[in-house]
Amino acid sequence: MVKNNIEVDVKVKCIENGMTQVKLAEEIDTTKAYVNRVIKKTDGVINHTFVQMMEVLGYDIELTYVKRGE
């Protein structure tokens, strides 16, 4: 199971960086609708098979975000 709420995480990181989802979409050459669909996806942004493998091995998944140095 993925412990993170990807939708909330992306929204928080957008706020922290003073960026809207529209601007984020423009930066990666896609639409806001696609960005929204990706972060709201019910089975998440993590590969479903990978999640299943980790669950069988007895692990949950937690994503950690590390700001890149500039």
Over which residues does each language-model region extend?
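Residues within the helices of the helix-turn-helix
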Residues: 11, 22, 36, 51
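Short acidic DE-rich linear segments
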Residues: 67-70
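A short, Lys/Arg-rich alpha-helix, primarily the initiator
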Residues: 1-17
